[in-house]
């Protein structure tokens, strides 16, 4: 991994690395925050998945998470949201193609050549983190919007691998809303059964479980009713007896003003779980 940015932050280092991804067949950037104790001991890892139009920069520059990651001694890994490059398929819209990988493995041309974000986040990136950084095997996952969807899917499909999961404003029923339907039709085809592998509410209804889910949702979020539908997640978790910490916030929208307001509580939540044995 090639170091391309290095910034001192709260006694640690906010770095950005570039590497070639075998899963995605392109060069990828990834943000890695190394807290002060990373120089002396191995630490647990929180993976953060960003939302539509984002890259690795949004979370590391806008959330203020470094203060809390330093306090709780957690390495934070923030990858890009899709494969990148002039040779990678793209679309002339914000919710498909580059910047909109949806953390799935595409099966349809032209997307299936590079869009294997599920494999990248689940397999390749954790292997690289273990090879290059002082990380323990204990990891948690979180994200925002499309990234909240990805975090929930990865945790639900791999409950023994992630200690905890949380999300800000996640797309909880992508097979039922325009963002998900349009992306899934392009990436996965018209067989809607295939869509359900990447739909948190559907996965839970099929019996996939995690110990607990934490979600924060702003009630002034323009996408709340049409695209996100947080109450669907709350309802299915109640039906399936999955513990939740779902909080609704008056006045907060879909932006990083919202994420930055509560990211400290999410990192503390994950730190508590990661440090339990």
Swiss-Prot record:
UniProt superkingdom: Bacteria
A Pfam family it matches: Esterase
First-level EC class: hydrolase
GO MF annotation: an example: carboxylic ester hydrolase activity
Keyword Hydrolase among UniProt keywords: yes
Gene Ontology biological process terms from the UniProt entry: formaldehyde catabolic process
Catalytically driven reaction(s): S-formylglutathione + H2O = formate + glutathione + H(+)
EC number: 3.1.2.12
Signal sequence, renumbered to the chain: none
Active site annotation, chain numbering: 145, 221, 254
Entry GO terms, CC: cytosol
Protein family (similarity comment): Belongs to the esterase D family.
Protein purpose: Serine hydrolase involved in the detoxification of formaldehyde. Hydrolyzes S-formylglutathione to glutathione and formate.
Name of the molecule in the record: S-formylglutathione hydrolase FrmB
Classification lineage: Bacteria, Pseudomonadati, Pseudomonadota, Gammaproteobacteria, Enterobacterales
Gene that encodes the chain: frmB
